[in-house]
Amino acid sequence: MAPNPPKGTSSRAWDAVTPPLSEWVLEAMSSMGFARMTPVQASAIPLFMAHKDVVVEAVTGSGKTLSFLLPIVEKLLRLEEPIKKHHIGAIIISPTRELASQIHSVMQSLLAFHPPSAAAMTPLDDDDAPRQKFPSSTLKVVPQLLLGGSTTPAEDLSRFLKLSPNVLVSTPGRLLELLSSPHVHCPQSSFEMLVLDEADRLLDLGFKETLQNILRRLPKQRRTGLFSASVSEAVDQIVRVGLRNPVKIMVKVKGTSGVDDKRTPASLQMTYLSTPPLHKFAALKNILSSVQPTPQKSIFFVSTCSGVDYLSAILPLLLGDDFLLIPLHGKHQANVRQKNFNRFLSSHSPAILLTTDVASRGLDIPSVDLVVQIDPPSDPKTFIHRCGRAGRAGRRGLSVVMLHPGREEDYVSFLDVRKTPVVPFSPSISFSDADATSATARARKAVLADRALHDRGQKAFVSWLRSYSKHQASSIFRVADLDWEALGKAWGLLKLPKMPELRSFTGDKTLGVSLDWDNFSYKDKQREKRRKELLQEAAESGVSQPSSNKRRASESVAWSQNAENKNKKLQRREYKKLKQEKTKWENMTEEERQKARETKEMVEELRAKNLEERRFRQAAAKAETAKAGGEDEEFKGFD
């Protein structure tokens, strides 16, 4: 147990906060190993507890989560009376499922030290769990996690009605669905605090409309906190969120010059490595072997989901058996993402998370030693978020961004201007053509064993190029400067894919590979059978073999056949769903059946209300359009 510092000896002591924190909170901080507050916590907690709106910009890994969790908990536990049933006291909005899950987990760990709240959080379906009884007038905090993909809106509503939480931790879309229910209440009399975590990302175009709809359902008289690593880049939109004279807190890190010139933790060393394209993936093993001690948790960032899918099959061949490589990207199913994320967290052997920017923001992954940006991010703002996965909470960390020699090295000066300085990777790494050739051979051996991996590689290379061409620092990352043959060989490709960018390329598009493509087969027997059938049809008709991609394959099937297959699939799915519901219903008690009926009625009522609102908005929009165009003459057609 981490000892508490003597009372009053430091402005960052937990017991020095004004207004003071509860005794059980002080005990929780000590038991959880937080000896004193971080600078951002020391600045934000007193203001947020003193009924101020706050805008907090601080480096990643600086302890922002507790900066809003503690004020929320303290506020709800100091009310004159408990919040009414099915009324909300606070909402925390997160841009990603993973971040929302982590915030909820931290809150549960904190509330475990508050007996009434801990008792209220006992799982509803755990009838055997001992449940301590408290009077109904006892103040407590009950959080509920809302995530799209893991549960349905109906299940979330059902759990809300049973649990009656007073704090919601959610992603924007699922939160809006729940708040649309007439059974969920956020009146001014009960609602206290709203937190937007990773605020700049929430205010992006993708969440803007959803966020505005949420805010319309919340009372204006509330306390609001915006927390992020780069709030300043979204300042123009903060006013729309509805803060009232917010206090802006900016916590920076002093550089070696003593000036506040860094936007990342001082414990994080940020470096760059200039590698020729042919040696890029081979150099990864050299990076891992040169870092001492051996990194136990590493994160490799690439630019696209397709890149993760392909490289997750190739990189283990180049890195050897010493590291467990785990893929994670935004197009994975929610259960796959959670499973892979948990595998990485719980791994006891050296592990590498191969991921996209889905893991660059907010995720509190403990003990990350190394971050390698195989692909520099298209948006320079993302650079510090990627780096910040390492060096969290004062722990030492190393970040490496890989650049091609030449113009890409100007990225170093570009980052320096943005107050994100990087230095050359040390110790220096030597590159040999023999290592690069060996890496290419191993990758190609795997690709030759299964045509599916070849298809995956072609798709990944094209998607990587599209991402590269859209880099915001386009004067530094130029498609015209790319060495196509070296890149293709480094990726282990058997040929360069057909792309508009290669129309003027006069080099060897086969990459020196001679292959009988007609006999290049899939490991999957059904897929290979289908390929041979298409090949036979092409030979008989005198037409060249169609492409193996899904689009061409689907064109060879009659539309009516596709429609029939789709209908059969939908029927099977519906039959399976009905069968599962019947089995579930038969296993229910009469009380459970009654609750299920009530929930169904509530959901149907909610859907009807949403449909009515949608029709009203459409009618209003139509009327507005008609009004705006009422003076226009009717189009008579062309002469």
From Swiss-Prot:
Q: Which residues cross the membrane?
A: none
Major site of localization recorded for this protein: nucleus
Ranges for domain Helicase ATP-binding come to 45-249
CDD domains the record matches = DEADc_DDX55 (cd17960), SF2_C_DEAD (cd18787)
Q: Which residues form the Helicase C-terminal domain?
A: 283-437
Quote the catalytic activity from the record: ATP + H2O = ADP + phosphate + H(+)
Any single GO molecular-function term of the entry would be: RNA binding
Q: What is its EC number?
A: 3.6.4.13
Checking SMART domains in the record gives: DEXDc (SM00487), DUF4217 (SM01178), HELICc (SM00490)
Q: Record's superkingdom?
A: Eukaryota
Q: Which InterPro entries match?
A: CTT_SPB4 (IPR056330), DEAD/DEAH_box_helicase_dom (IPR011545), Helicase_ATP-bd (IPR014001), Helicase_C-like (IPR001650), P-loop_NTPase (IPR027417), RNA-helicase_DEAD-box_CS (IPR000629), RNA_helicase_DEAD_Q_motif (IPR014014), SPB4-like_CTE (IPR025313)
Q: Name one GO biological process term.
A: maturation of LSU-rRNA
Q: Which residues form a coiled coil?
A: 561-624
List of residues binding ATP: A58, V59, T60, G61, S62, G63, K64, T65
Its GO CC terms are: 90S preribosome; nucleolus; nucleoplasm; preribosome, large subunit precursor
Question: Any idea which UniProt keywords this protein has?
Answer: ATP-binding, Coiled coil, Helicase, Hydrolase, Nucleotide-binding, Nucleus, Ribosome biogenesis, RNA-binding, rRNA processing
Assembly: Component of pre-60S ribosomal complexes.
Family according to the record: Belongs to the DEAD box helicase family. DDX55/SPB4 subfamily.
Name the UniProt record assigns to this protein: ATP-dependent rRNA helicase spb4
Coding gene? spb4
